[in-house]
């Protein structure tokens, strides 16, 4: 199995390094990751400037100022030959649950892999300690995929409780929960008296029902949420069409 491995925490982050070491025991792994933390970069792609890469002695490649999406795009289309069999993103330092997937560079890297035609996993740890647990879970899933491919055409968003492996209760297939809207902005002043602003933490849980990713992780289970790229709200199409007809938009300007 040939794996393109990326993340949004940066090439030196403990999550990606722990996972790379574990994956290399049974797979051919090429790391292509940002040279710095690009958390929250979502699906952004660098179009207005060129991208430089740096290759380390162990073969890992850092993309200078690159986003997670840049890294997977370059990895698939230029840097990994032969091309990968699968794209894996992670292990992220912290969860990507519910609405987090909108902003997540970790999920975006997997999404780019799927967009380019490859199976893709995004892996996040609900904390900053037991990366070995998340690595073991990921390896188990990938070994299973080797034996029997999962032909859903979907991204698997995997969130792992920050627990020792022997305390993980199992795996649940879940849906995305949701958070309350975030509203915290933290102002500061620089030495010249100019105001600086920091984006605050995400909102608290809003929908954390028993079938959600939030609930699974809170209860000690690995959460696997299948994600797809199509953002169309199919069940709203008729409602919008009826509304347009009723208000006359499209027949008079």
UniProtKB/Swiss-Prot annotation:
The enzyme's E.C. designation: 3.1.3.5, 3.1.3.6, 3.6.1.11
GO MF annotation terms: 3'-nucleotidase activity; 5'-nucleotidase activity; exopolyphosphatase activity; metal ion binding; nucleotide binding
Co-factor binding details: Binds 1 divalent metal cation per subunit.
Localization, UniProt: Cytoplasm
Pfam families: SurE
Key words of the record: Cytoplasm, Hydrolase, Metal-binding, Nucleotide-binding
An annotated GO cellular component: cytoplasm
Cofactor: a divalent metal cation
InterPro entries cross-referenced by the UniProt entry: SurE, SurE-like_Pase/nucleotidase, SurE-like_sf
Binding-site list for a divalent metal cation: 8-9, 39, 92
Role according to the record: Nucleotidase with a broad substrate specificity as it can dephosphorylate various ribo- and deoxyribonucleoside 5'-monophosphates and ribonucleoside 3'-monophosphates with highest affinity to 3'-AMP. Also hydrolyzes polyphosphate (exopolyphosphatase activity) with the preference for short-chain-length substrates (P20-25). Might be involved in the regulation of dNTP and NTP pools, and in the turnover of 3'-mononucleotides produced by numerous intracellular RNases (T1, T2, and F) during the degradation of various RNAs.
Protein name: 5'/3'-nucleotidase SurE
Organism of derivation: Escherichia fergusonii (strain ATCC 35469 / DSM 13698 / CCUG 18766 / IAM 14443 / JCM 21226 / LMG 7866 / NBRC 102419 / NCTC 12128 / CDC 0568-73)
């Amino acid at each position: 199995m040939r794996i393109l491995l990326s993340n949004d925490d940066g090439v030196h982050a403990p999550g990606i390094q722990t996972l790379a070491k574990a994956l290399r025991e049974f797979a051919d792994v090429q790391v292509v990751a940002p040279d710095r933390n690009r958390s929250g970069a979502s699906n952004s792609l660098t179009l207005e400037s060129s991208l430089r890469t740096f290759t380390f002695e162990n073969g890992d490649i850092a993309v200078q100022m690159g986003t997670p999406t840049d890294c997977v795009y370059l990895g698939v289309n230029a840097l990994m030959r032969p091309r990968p069999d699968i794209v894996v993103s992670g292990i992220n330092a912290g969860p990507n649950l519910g609405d987090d997937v909108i902003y997540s560079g970790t999920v975006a890297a997997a999404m780019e892999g799927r967009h380019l035609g490859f199976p893709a996993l995004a892996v996040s740890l609900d904390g900053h300690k037991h990366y070995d647990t998340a690595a073991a879970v990921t390896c188990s899933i990938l070994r299973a995929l080797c034996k029997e491919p999962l032909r859903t055409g979907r991204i698997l968003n995997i969130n792992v409780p920050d627990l020792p492996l022997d305390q993980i209760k199992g795996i649940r297939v879940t849906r995305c929960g949701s958070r309350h809207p975030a509203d915290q902005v933290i102002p500061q002043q620089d030495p010249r008296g100019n105001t600086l602003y920091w984006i605050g933490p995400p909102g608290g849980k809003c929908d954390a029902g028993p079938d959600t990713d939030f609930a699974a992780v809170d209860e000690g289970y690995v959460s696997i949420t299948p994600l797809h790229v199509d953002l169309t709200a199919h069940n709203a199409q008729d409602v919008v069409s009826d509304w347009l007809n009723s208000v006359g938009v499209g027949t008079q300007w």
